[in-house]
């Protein structure tokens, strides 16, 4: 039954966590690590102080964080209020984390004369700057860059699709992928 299945999955999840406690489900766990990097020490400790161990999956690997045990003011602290500007500062950290994760998957097919993580990060920054901000779009852009080379988006026909702001980012990216497929199609 669904109740038995739910109980079994809950048991497996809680038993796989090395420390007994509760799980907090974030809407977008990939942002948790970058958020911890972007906030100041006090805000980071206030966030981490709400639990004894934090575990999250960033789409590539499991991550872990613990609060500072030498914190001079332990005890209850309200969670910090984060402004939109502060959340925007997480973007470079998120892109760097994605680049590090993609390196393991794509390193064998990347240019040999550059550092893999730096090359991937530069491509992800290009994609983000062009309006492709979702993780699925970032990886699709990266695959295009691997196949077509860095700066592919500045050359026709890709530049034509990229400049068409009347279309959604997903549509423009699909059109660029289609152009690549047309290049390699047999007649």
Which residue stretches match the model-derived regions?
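A contiguous, surface-oriented mixed alpha/beta subdomain in the mid-to-C-terminal portion of proteins
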Residues: 2-187
